[in-house]
Amino acid sequence: MTLQQKELFQKSPLLLENGETLSPVLVGYETYGTLSASRDNCILLEHALTGTAHAAKHFEDDAPGWWDDYIGPGKTIDTDKYFLVCTNVFGGCSGTTGPSSINPKTGEPFRLQFPGFSIKDIIKVQRELLEQLGVTRIVSVIGGSMGGMQATEWAIDYADITDSIINIASPLAAGPDAIGYNLIMRMAILNDPDFNGGNYVGQPEGGLATARMVGMMTYRTSELFSKRFERFTVAESSPAAFSKEHFQIESYLQYQGDTFVERFDANSYLYLTKAIDLFDVTAPAKDDLPAFSKIKIPYLLIGITTDQLFRIHDLRRGYELLKEWDVPVTYHEVASEYGHDAFLVEKEVPKFEPLIRSFLSNLPVKSI
């Protein structure tokens, strides 16, 4: 079954963390496997910043998903055993209500009139969807990068129906370097003349492509770039090369930027990167205790030692904090020349798959 959509918050509006409301909210999602009679065999999979709900193929000729190697009969997320749900995040642009959606009050796209939102708001929408789908318990919430932030929020806000968390390459709070990169990317978009205060007709392609290029430099490593590109040049030149020498790394980054603008919305990029910046579960909650101290369910944290976006020292610090507060946390580190995006790379599956499979297989037995 491919992308489905469900309209939520029709009678009672979605109340966001900042006090604003929104109604209705359309959610795009895909499911794999079958919900059990006891409705407690669900795994919720969270995508990263620019991901979609299409996590895996549904049939042989289907478009590849972003986690095909982990999903299917007999695989890590065994669809003969689990009912997997993957949503497009609230505020995104691939099936779920976001800045490019039509504002029912005006008949025009929300654009920058869309309300600000947090990671907590994203999972609130997911919780409503799962309730509508009849899910009563979640075996595990799994996510990498921004998806790991969502998974962590689930452990805090909805531990009553969640049995475990798997967080890959995501800290307990966005660090200053990640926030800085996000600022640079947003400024590239905001300073594009075609952005027009968010009221663009076509994409502000130059700014959005530049933002993507900056992002790609943080998702990979200098080791990988050196091995793949060295100082090699390509035959064709480009105005951006500013000379007849056009380096392969330049061509690669331009390709990444050019293809990205065809599938992603600039306003969504602004909102989602800001939601990442604001994520901080180390901050005191209403009871003056750090929000993460409420986590009482098994929590797998996987850090990537070569990560250029969410640095390994932040993951290690997160692990120490979780231990200090008696969170039942398991921590592993993976080394990879692919850096932050290693968990999305087919070649690196043998490094991650055993950790995830072992964690899931050692959870307390439930009626699944």
From Swiss-Prot:
The active site is at S145, D307, H340. Keywords: Acyltransferase, Amino-acid biosynthesis, Cytoplasm, Methionine biosynthesis, Transferase. Gene3D superfamilies: 1.10.1740.110, alpha/beta hydrolase (3.40.50.1820). It holds the Pfam family Abhydrolase_1. It is found in: Cytoplasm. Substrate binds at R212, D341. The keyword Methyltransferase does not apply. Its EC number is 2.3.1.31. InterPro entries: AB_hydrolase_1 (IPR000073), AB_hydrolase_fold (IPR029058), HAT_MetX-like (IPR008220). Transfers an acetyl group from acetyl-CoA to L-homoserine, forming acetyl-L-homoserine. Belongs to the AB hydrolase superfamily. MetX family. PANTHER family: HOMOSERINE O-ACETYLTRANSFERASE. This is Homoserine O-acetyltransferase. It comes from Listeria monocytogenes serovar 1/2a (strain ATCC BAA-679 / EGD-e).
